[in-house]
């Protein structure tokens, strides 16, 4: 038993928080294969029962970043990866928004995986749309540079995550690893729109982003529990801008968007969700388009492309109506 895991389990058994340096060391021990399955399970369960701190989340992310593959990216790159886990069954809102954001001129390094909530993750829907999940890091760099968007499949860039797959599966509960995806972008995206599935995660993830040196980001959770900027009502959000953290509320009706029901946003199988995304990019109007505009507009504000969400929504609408967003999809398909 390593010193780090012994000390960590001792502290967790007393419901005490782990110091950042100790957390970083114990994750390194985990990644190097020095921990037994029982120790890994105890660590993850202990953190979950105690409640993970922003410092613990950031230390996990820093250790995993060091173990993952990386790509070079333009300075203004953004990611729309969220935590998932809201179990809402909506279509792939942030993935669809990624095409719109890229069409508006902000490079998007979309980090994602197969489904974590609902029935369809970003990888599942992009695969249905004809985008290769097997792009090499070199190809992804080219896509980002010349097309303005790429998909970074988490399984390719973070093979070390496989070291805890069995323990996570056998525990069967949410663990700290469910929070890490948005913090592990291989392109090091300095801008983010990060949806979380619970109001309790909002300040934690915002603080973790601040610790990790995020340039500017918006963390959001809908009052309906959606891990997106929602269209059914208000969204609680936090803007991280360098060293500052600023809470605010997003109300769709203030931007001329009609409220809808969760039923209006429902998705289905990967094939069905792919069709929803395609129809939006082809110009279909309605609540599905509107929630994509709202999320893309918020992301463009986070990326400093727009002075506010209202201007961001206008830029997002132009991206869709001009065909630029659809063109991003077509170029990515052609490069597969």
UniProtKB/Swiss-Prot annotation:
Its cofactor is Mg(2+). The gene is trpD. InterPro entries: Anthranilate_Pribosyl_Tfrase (IPR005940), Glycosyl_Trfase_fam3 (IPR000312), Glycosyl_Trfase_fam3_N_dom (IPR017459), Glycosyl_Trfase_fam3_N_dom_sf (IPR036320), Nuc_phospho_transferase (IPR035902). Anthranilate 1 binds at residues 82, 113. This is Anthranilate phosphoribosyltransferase. One of its GO terms (molecular function) is anthranilate phosphoribosyltransferase activity. Homodimer. It comes from Desulfitobacterium hafniense (strain DSM 10664 / DCB-2). Its EC number is 2.4.2.18.
